[in-house]
Regions:
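Membrane-embedded alpha-helical bundles of multi-pass enzymes
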Residues: 1-211
């Protein structure tokens, strides 16, 4: 399979996993802990394909984000209105939210080029949290796809939301995905670091479940 096709496939898989994880769509909340891994792998494939990674990854990221938005917001199309209204009702939020979700991934790439991978991971976490916070406070708020909402069918997992709010779940999901990704990315080159990151991933995943 051509490299570009593999990148597109990985990005699309990420969007599909998020849809399957989402309440009222798939409901497999545990998939949230691995749903970003195909997207992060797509980024690695993109860097290998473009050598120095200078070509934009943004369009590839948008594919997965668009699928996630479309598969979880399709019900806007079910309104009892003319077809034009149906298309606008689903198209505007899906496209708009896809672009907003793409901004943290775009800025992550900029951070990775100038500061390195660790800072890029930190940038993604901070920027995504900031984006979700914005979505809860401005006039165009659309909190439906905030990552922390994925545990809506598993309240026993997130009793601590009373202290952290939904953003605590978002942080949990992001850090777990990034920690697992670090294990995968370093497994062949630095086994010791991979083991350390594996221990971190288990701690990040497990501690909130027993809190």
């Amino acid at each position: 399979m051509p490299a570009r096709a593999r990148i597109l496939l990985m990005s699309a898989l990420s969007g599909l996993l998020w849809a399957l994880a989402w309440p009222a769509i798939g409901g497999f909340a545990w998939l949230a802990f691995v749903a970003w891994l195909p997207m992060l792998h797509a980024e690695r494939l993109h860097e290998l394909r473009t050598k120095e990674g200078k070509r934009a990854f943004f369009p590839y990221a948008l594919l997965g984000l668009f699928l996630w938005n479309a598969l979880t917001t399709y019900w806007f199309f079910l309104v009892s209105e003319p077809m034009t209204t149906k298309l606008v009702s689903v198209g505007v939020p899906v496209v708009g939210n896809t672009l907003l979700m793409g901004i943290p991934w775009w800025l992550r790439r900029l951070a990775k080029r100038s500061l390195g991978g660790r800072w890029a991971d930190a940038a993604l976490v901070v920027l995504w949290l900031a984006g979700e916070r914005l979505h809860h406070s401005w006039d165009l708020q659309w909190p439906w796809l905030s990552l922390g909402n994925v545990f809506g069918t598993q309240p026993a997992w997130v009793q601590w939301y009373e202290f952290t709010g939904m953003l605590g779940g978002t942080l949990w999901v992001l850090v777990t995905n990034l920690a697992i990704n670090a294990v995968i990315a370093t497994w062949g080159s630095s086994r010791q670091r991979s083991l350390r990151m594996g221990a971190l991933a288990l701690a990040v995943l497990g501690l909130p479940l027993i809190a």
